[in-house]
Swiss-Prot record:
InterPro entries: UPF0145_dom_sf, UPF0145_YbjQ-like. It holds the Pfam family YbjQ_1. This is UPF0145 protein Hlac_1015. PANTHER family: UPF0145 PROTEIN SCO3412 (PTHR34068:SF2), UPF0145 PROTEIN YBJQ (PTHR34068). Belongs to the UPF0145 family.
Amino acid sequence: MELSNTESIAGKEVVETLGLVRGNTVRARNVGRDITQGLRNLAGGELKGYTELMTDARDQAQDRMIEEAEALGADGVINVRFTTSSIADSGAEILAYGTAVRLR
């Protein structure tokens, strides 16, 4: 599956547009992680626990988007975008979306 955040993929021609595809996941924060990350936040620096959480969530959302594209018979997704939003006080949603296409 070829992915691109632009309207095209170099060296490929879009021969059919199959429609919007998306994948999402909602992740809740971990109380234990919140405590350690809160202490680290006082000292400054990267909050690696949250970085890992968001990276894993983005990967899962992207994988789900790809599964939806494959179900349509696509071999590419163009205009790929990611969004995040807060869910309640302790959760975050990651949404990956794009346009499923057939390429030549």
